[in-house]
Amino acid sequence: MQPSFWHEKWDAQQIGFHLSAVNPLLVKYWQQLELDADSQVFVPLCGKSLDMCFLAEQGHDVLGCELNELAVQQFYRENALAFDVTKLAEHQRFHTEQVTIYQGDIFSLDVAEMPSTTAFYDRAALIAWPEEMRLAYARQLAKLIPANSVGLLITLDYPQAELNGPPFAVSDDWVQANLSQDFKIERLASEDVLRDNPRFVKKQVSWLTESVYRLIRKG
């Protein structure tokens, strides 16, 4: 999957993956990470997610990474946030008091840009990658996240042959097999959410499961 795919989606505003409200699973499970209020939280492939506003409201310093510049600009403008922009070697750094977003490729994001990170939140990043690219993303996430950082991961799983992603199906088996090298994994919840997702119902997907994980970066 090439960057042009996502740029075209944002240019056409075909952004069905964007939620118009804070993710209820974030609200329900975030406190289980037991973070200090001033913790810095990394949000990969953040888009213009309102989840970042929720995290900032908890007192966190939010650090996002997003490929598409329009998505970043819309986040700040739609939330009436004044921002500064700094040009870096590989990214543009958009900044306001509690939310900083690096606009550019996550694979070229330097770990030196996030030395204070102690937590992360992935709702739409892991499931955005087809299987042949997903492991490379997981390895990059592990590279960026300091040891002992804690994170909340939300995944979707369904019969991949029944629907073309994104979002792509990520099974519990895949999570356990491919993330356990770098993270301690605890599945907090797993629910049938087919009836809540009309696109999947319309495409006659036979089942759809949403899972929530608590991850801790190994030392």
From Swiss-Prot:
Indicate the enzyme's highest-level EC class: transferase
Q: What is its main location?
A: cytoplasm
The residues that hold S-adenosyl-L-methionine are 10, 45, 66, 123
One Gene Ontology cellular component term attached to this UniProt record is:
cytoplasm
Q: Which reaction does it catalyse?
A: S-adenosyl-L-methionine + a thiopurine = S-adenosyl-L-homocysteine + a thiopurine S-methylether
Q: Which Pfam families match?
A: TPMT (PF05724)
Q: Which domain of life is it from?
A: Bacteria
**To which protein family does this belong?**
Belongs to the class I-like SAM-binding methyltransferase superfamily. TPMT family.
Q: What is this protein called?
A: Thiopurine S-methyltransferase
- Organism equals Shewanella halifaxensis (strain HAW-EB4)
Give me the gene this protein comes from: tpm
